[in-house]
């Protein structure tokens, strides 16, 4: 028993060293550097606007984060999607969502799916101030906004059509449907559910986050007295299904703050963020005694274990102004930091490299992988997707990036069969009849025929 205790102690001491290559370093901000303003992505103008308000004195955190959102929603300095009505849903509707949280008393106000009102963050502020609710949505949110004095506006139809028409002419690709007919990869609908026996194994299509084309931004302000506010603003995912609510409006998904411990901003695939509430998880990790760096990495690893294809980032700030970040699926995750020391202001764009999702999930590729290299159609009752499968065996220690470059370039899709009964089933079928294989019969085929990055199930 004594030996086991020593081994456990040794492993605990060595764990930070073993994880050092993946860790994201914390950036301590001395007390004299407070107040502190952090915003996601590299939108320096919006951060500057928020910082101008924050540095006016204590208890300006709420107005500071609101000012940052106002700058984004009233200009194109935070990208076309946020300021230019360029993120319609699949029916051409333009809606906004926003949220605001007070770290002193946990008051929260948010709106989602709100059309015709530009000042989404202002309406969210009114929900926080004038109601006992936390979230209003849809047409009712717009009516509430008008009752609070916000003017209804007509969005630019030409700007929306410039985005929507090419998408419609391209058979509505990409979209957010799956397991429907007609096939979502080749049609704009109207869709209906596929019979249960024809539905494919669940697999997400992740859309890349392009620099300067972000549909969500978050702001977090901390003053010298320890007051925290966080706010978020989003135009929603482009070509989303009408009625969809995003992470920017959901408590703990995009933003969270608690004066007692700190706050967090999360951004990326909103549908994944809403399932895990990473901003809340990060703040609770701080409460449990973790540093911002370890909290950010732990939360990101948790997301990746369940959604290996996730793209996004997370910034975590302690109540003392120490901050760190973690990300996945991006070349680099950037955020803007402003602070003050001895009357002198500083502002910088921070950039971090993301975790290697392959190593986070599996420690590197090994075992049997099946690369779908060709798709053909065969008739029989109903059309059936036949996929030609190439068997590839990797030994332990093969570098994941080398594997991608050598085997996966220009492939239509890739899948990894988990160890277990289904994997054995696939192996036996391949041994008996290598070549064409009806993967859908085993429930292993991805949705047709989107292109996928290298994905671990």
Swiss-Prot record:
Tell me which positions the record assigns to the signal sequence.
1-20
* GO cellular component, as recorded: lysosome
Disulfide bridge map: 72-78, 172-188, 327-354
Q: Show the PANTHER family listed in the entry.
A: L-ASPARAGINASE, N(4)-(BETA-N-ACETYLGLUCOSAMINYL)-L-ASPARAGINASE
Coiled-coil spans are none
User: What is the recorded name of this protein?
Assistant: L-asparaginase-like protein GL17509
Q: Which UniProt keywords apply?
A: Disulfide bond, Signal
Q: Which organism is it from?
A: Drosophila persimilis
Family statement drawn from the similarity comment of this UniProt entry: Belongs to the Ntn-hydrolase family.
Stored InterPro entries: Ntn_hydrolases_N, Peptidase_T2
Annotated membrane-spanning segments are: none
- What Gene3D superfamilies does this protein's entry cite? (Glycosyl)asparaginase (3.60.20.30)
Which GO molecular function, any one, fits this protein according to its record? N4-(beta-N-acetylglucosaminyl)-L-asparaginase activity
């Amino acid at each position: 028993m004594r030996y086991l205790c020593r081994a456990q102690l040794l492993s605990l001491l060595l764990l930070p060293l073993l994880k050092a290559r993946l860790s994201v370093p914390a950036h301590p901000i001395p007390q004299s550097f407070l107040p502190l303003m952090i915003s996601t992505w590299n939108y320096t103008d919006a951060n500057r606007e928020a910082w101008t308000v924050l540095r006016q004195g204590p208890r300006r955190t709420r107005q500071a984060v609101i000012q940052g959102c106002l700058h984004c929603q009233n200009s194109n300095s935070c990208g076309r999607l946020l300021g230019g009505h360029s993120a319609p849903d699949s029916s051409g509707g333009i809606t906004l969502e926003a949220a605001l949280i007070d770290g002193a008393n946990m008051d929260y106000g948010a709106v989602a799916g709100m059309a015709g009102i530009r000042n989404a963050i202002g309406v969210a502020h009114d929900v926080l101030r004038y109601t006992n609710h936390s979230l209003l949505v849809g047409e009712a949110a717009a009516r509430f906004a008008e009752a609070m004095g916000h003017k209804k506006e007509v969005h630019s139809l030409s700007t929306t059509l410039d985005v929507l028409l090419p998408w419609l002419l391209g058979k509505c690709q990409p979209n957010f449907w799956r397991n429907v007919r007609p096939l979502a990869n080749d049609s704009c609908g109207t869709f209906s559910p596929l019979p249960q026996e024809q539905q494919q194994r669940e697999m997400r299509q992740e859309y890349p986050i392009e620099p300067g084309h972000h549909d969500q931004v978050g702001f977090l302000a901390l003053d010298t007295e320890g007051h925290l506010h966080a706010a978020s603003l989003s135009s929603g995912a482009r070509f989303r299904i009408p009625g969809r609510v995003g992470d920017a409006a959901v408590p703990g998904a995009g933003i969270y703050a608690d004066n007692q411990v700190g706050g967090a901003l999360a951004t990326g695939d909103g549908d994944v963020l809403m399932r895990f509430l990473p901003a809340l998880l990060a703040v609770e990790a701080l409460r449990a005694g973790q540093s911002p760096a370890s909290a950010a990495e732990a939360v990101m690893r948790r997301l990746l274990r369940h959604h290996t294809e996730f793209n996004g980032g997370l910034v975590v700030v302690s109540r003392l102004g120490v901050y760190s970040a973690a990300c996945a699926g991006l070349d680099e995750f950037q955020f803007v930091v402003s602070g003050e020391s001895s009357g002198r202001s500083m502002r910088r764009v921070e950039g971090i490299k993301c975790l290697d999702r392959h190593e986070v999930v599996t420690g590197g590729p090994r075992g049997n992988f099946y690369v779908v290299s060709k798709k053909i159609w065969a008739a029989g009752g109903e059309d059936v997707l036949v996929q030609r499968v190439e068997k590839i065996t990797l030994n332990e220690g093969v570098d994941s990036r080398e594997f991608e470059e050598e085997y996966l370039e220009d492939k239509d899709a890739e899948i990894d069969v988990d160890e277990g009964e289904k994997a054995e089933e696939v192996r036996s079928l391949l041994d008996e009849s290598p070549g064409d294989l009806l993967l859908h019969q085993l429930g292993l085929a991805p949705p047709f025929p989107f292109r996928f990055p290298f994905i671990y199930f």
